[in-house]
Amino acid sequence: MLLNLFKFSKKLFQENFNKVKLLNHCKSFLFLGESDNKFFTNEKSELVFSDKRDRPFSSDRINRPFSPDKKGEPIFPDKRDRPFSPDRINRPFSPDKKGEPIFP
């Protein structure tokens, strides 16, 4: 009985090990199917971007829309014209968008 338990645990371990191996193999090819060549994976399966402007997220672009030419300048040069600002959270916008709340 102890021998059967050992065989079962060995078989279970081998199945789980194979699943982890397959999962890691799939992860390494996750981003290789993209055809636009904006990014690729290196040998460590990390996402590598060919150009800094192609990154989908950058810490200095939080809550800031991208400009059409992707140079990093915001579309709205005036802070009052931005559709979202962290200091306006949970506060309705005024119709003239000057920053005053609708309900004082």
From Swiss-Prot:
The keyword Plastid applies. It is found in: Plastid. One of its GO terms (cellular component) is plastid. Keywords: Plastid. Its main location: plastid. Residues 55-104 are annotated as: Disordered. It comes from the Eukaryota. This is Uncharacterized 12.4 kDa protein in rps4-rps11 intergenic region. It comes from Euglena longa.
